[in-house]
Amino acid sequence: MNLKDRIGADLGRRVSLEEGIAWAAERGVKFIDAQLDITPNGLTTFDAARCDAIREAAGAADIHLGLHTLSGVNIAEYSPFLSEAVDDYLKAYIDVAVRLKAEWVVVHPGHHFGDKEERMEAAVGHISKASAYAEEVGATLFLENMNWEPDLAEVHYLAHTLEEAQYYFERLTLPSLKWSFTVNHAHLVPDGIDGFIDGLDMSRLGEVRIADCTGEYEIHMKPGEGNIDFGHMFERIEASGFKGHYMNAFGNLEDMNDARDYLVERAVVAGVDAR
């Protein structure tokens, strides 16, 4: 599979999965993911009939489907009732992934309000339970490194620094859990994209998520509008032996499709074999 075919588009909650598959098939996009929290893709709407039809449509178009949980759901919950709800939420996503034959589910490390250590411990517990269940049913989870928030913000995402990401991956070792590398998030912290590549186990890399930014704030810009060196990024990641997919996550669907050519061009200029 050539590099362009390995670059997909994040449907998010923009369209139904059925519409998203049709859109991707028309444009030759081979990788898509979607969030299933609200209409038109609410988790509870995926009965056997709907899952069968989606599986058939994706298979016929040779489209690889993934799911993406909502980062606003705090996976680092430790409060009674809410903690149990987190486990149920992740299990429900995994169950739908199995029914859809979705190849991955992106999960998040949670967020904290100043109680970082307690939240990280709770998050590892929830993700450990989810990855054990995924292992049992044949699903794969991708844990995403998150974005920095301004220092005076009340809420802060976890695993936005290399050190925090290492905390998670050192404790979550089942094969069913891999890494979703969001490069624009890494670009917001001193570690940078290179720091994450050097500091985490690249053999666990499941996907690379792409948007541009200026390194100042969490803004998902189209590649070329910020200052990320995408040529260098591709050079480093491809040199690691990574053969998986990249996922565009910015703008609208057409922006993400159009940017695939720009990204391939940046890779080729950097000496990457895009064939």
What are the residue ranges of the model-derived segments?
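Conserved beta-strand positions in the central sheet of alpha/beta enzyme cores
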Residues: 33, 66, 106, 142, ...
